[in-house]
Amino acid sequence: MARPVKTPHAASQDNKPLTGKAAFFDIDGTLISTNVVHAYGYYAMNEGSLPGIVRRTLSTVAQIPLFGALNFVDRKIFNEYFYRQYEGLTEDRLLTLTEDLFEDVVKPAIYPKAKDLIDEARRAGCRVVLVTGALDFTMRPLARHLGADDMIANRMQFVGGIATGKVIPPIIEGANKANVIREYCETHGISLMKSYAYTDSSSDYAMLTVVGRPTAVNPDIRLRALARSYNWPILDVR
């Protein structure tokens, strides 16, 4: 059963040898065909009040080009800007809709061979860890469904049960994924060199270079080129 965690916290291992190994999986585009915008769109369309639904839906649609541009330029800036859209939504409502989000949006979008990839990692003796820029509560049902051991994800700040639109640091994105993976391995006695990483995006390049066994999955054009130049395995699970 999955045991999603919010963020890793580094701890001293007293110089003990790191003997374990893990498989770190990006989610959006790697295991599923949806992304964080789809998840928010679902919440916006099921907010509860008709005026709220209309306002948030129209705002989301109008900003899609901006979301795309920010995501292309800087994933960290995109995350900070995008998650402001959650401001004002209630924690209770978001959590109530989580299972519906999974059944209606996420589960149908799981790539056909994604589960096989995770099962293969488990047979190899790896601890399965999902690493995503998505909000933790949106991906918990997926982590459970896939049988992941842990999940490293972004966390929304709530004050008085209301979302502030701010993500609690550290923000899980592109280059910073390498840092949180490094911390996670240190905390859990896992060897980076024995571990695997899987992603579809060149923005996660650092995540691949921090482990000894990187794999490009459904890679974008730039990541495919990088994978070929470094002789990394290239997989298609779609």
Regions found by a protein language model. Give the residues of each.
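Intrinsically disordered, low-complexity N-terminal regions enriched in serine/proline/glycine
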Residues: 39-41, 85, 183, 229
